[in-house]
């Protein structure tokens, strides 16, 4: 179920304050955040936001196509190492 349109998109307050301050100062620093739940706002376009994935911060350069998505969608939390390789003992007939 999607969020109600009358509420508007959720953006953590501390993150929006940093983005607005950088926009007014015309500054483009990397903003580190743990807020994966925040929605990408049009004011964030052009900024690089380092989103925490549980282990490290993944730099995400925000483009217009990302508006409306969550920041966590662009910082994967799981790494797939591949399925186990076939061994001689596993392929032997029983």
From Swiss-Prot:
InterPro entries the record matches: Ribosomal_uS19, Ribosomal_uS19_bac-type, Ribosomal_uS19_CS, Ribosomal_uS19_SF
UniProt keyword annotation of Glycoprotein present: no
Keywords: Ribonucleoprotein, Ribosomal protein, RNA-binding, rRNA-binding
A single GO cellular-component term on record: cytoplasm
MF GO annotations: rRNA binding; structural constituent of ribosome
Keyword Transmembrane helix: no
GO-annotated biological processes: ribosomal small subunit assembly; translation
Its job: Protein S19 forms a complex with S13 that binds strongly to the 16S ribosomal RNA.
Family per similarity comment: Belongs to the universal ribosomal protein uS19 family.
Stated name of the protein: Small ribosomal subunit protein uS19
Encoding gene, per UniProt annotation: rpsS
């Amino acid at each position: 179920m999607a969020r109600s349109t009358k509420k508007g998109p959720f953006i953590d307050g501390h993150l929006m304050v940093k983005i607005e301050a950088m926009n007014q100062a015309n500054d483009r620093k990397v903003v580190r955040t743990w807020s994966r739940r925040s929605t990408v706002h049009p004011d964030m376009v052009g900024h690089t936001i380092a989103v925490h994935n549980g282990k490290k911060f993944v730099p995400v350069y925000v483009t217009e196509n990302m508006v409306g998505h969550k920041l966590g969608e662009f910082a994967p939390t799981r790494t797939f190492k591949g399925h186990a390789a076939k061994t001689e003992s596993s392929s032997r007939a029983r």
